[in-house]
């Protein structure tokens, strides 16, 4: 593949100045569910990855895709908790404790994605109820853009700035 058509990871800047990076492989999985067709349903899953020890970046190197039991509609996605949790547990075990749950992703049938009231309520619920010690990330994949938010307890949510490497 020539350099001009080389796939790049997606990189977002966190408020701390560190990077939040989506690997090419993870991004390619999500791209397969972009809602270009008028009858396409929302899709989603969990973000899996690693915190670099030096604190310079968090890398999403895998995602779960829609699974049996997920509920999908044109403007709604609800993931089956147990099946995605099994994938989280398997990733953790296979990596000997280095690949972890980082957050959630889903698609929207709009060019520039904006969180719905249902999305925001779900994010706030996760920040209050999920068991975690690091920030959680919430990613929405639109038909022409991607947006990522970083969440901290109890309910602070900030949109991250994105950029394209090599641009």
What are these regions (language model features)?
Residues 1-101, 110-167:
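Conserved beta-strand-loop surface patch within small alpha/beta domains used
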Residues 106-108:
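Histidine-centered divalent metal-coordination motifs
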